[in-house]
């Protein structure tokens, strides 16, 4: 989202995510036009503005699309994201080492995973955890935190089965 905001010259963006927490902990992350999250004192200004909202009007999705309030983001943003990340990395002096990658049921497979593959990194995706699923069915305690060894158990198993020495994981919202 941070890249898309800048690429589309948007005023900001919103992610609804439990991040690396259990599914019941969904929350909102607001991003400013520069692509970063709101920080003090702007975060308080945003919170105060949200607190003043008395009601939220709803409309059918199709109507939102037909009125221009909702628009699909083209594949070009994804292509630009990959190109920008590849351009920021110097080619390695030696071949990349193979890696097992897990997005822990989140969106990182189409961001981090695609960038790794485009860079030429030999990537083996952890298959069960590459399927987006906000219930996090394969993660102990339903807490997909890549800093938790238990969350990476399946990826480690995949690495051992494939003779790979490196495991990489991202939290579900890939931030």
Regions found by a protein language model. Give the residues of each.
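A generic local secondary-structure boundary/capping motif
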Residues: 2-5, 17, 89, 155-156, ...
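Generic detector of short, well-ordered, non-transmembrane alpha-helical segments enriched
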Residues: 42, 164-165
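Ferredoxin-reductase
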Residues: 1-34
């Amino acid at each position: 989202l941070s890249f898309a905001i800048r690429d589309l010259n948007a005023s900001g963006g919103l992610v609804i995510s439990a991040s690396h927490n259990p599914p019941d902990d969904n929350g909102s992350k607001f991003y400013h036009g520069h692509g970063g999250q709101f920080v003090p004192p702007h975060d308080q200004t945003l919170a105060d503005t949200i607190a003043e909202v008395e009601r939220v009007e709803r409309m059918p999705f199709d109507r939102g699309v037909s009125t221009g309030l909702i628009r699909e983001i083209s594949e070009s943003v994804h292509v630009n994201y990959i190109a920008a990340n590849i351009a920021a990395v110097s080619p390695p002096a030696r071949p990349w080492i193979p890696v097992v990658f897990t997005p822990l049921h989140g969106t990182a497979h189409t961001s981090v995973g695609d960038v790794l593959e485009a860079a030429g990194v030999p990537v083996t995706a952890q298959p069960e955890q590459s399927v987006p699923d906000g219930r996090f069915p394969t993660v102990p305690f339903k807490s997909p935190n890549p800093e938790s060894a238990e969350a990476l158990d399946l990826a480690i198993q995949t690495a051992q089965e494939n003779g790979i020495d490196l495991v990489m994981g991202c939290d579900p919202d890939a931030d």
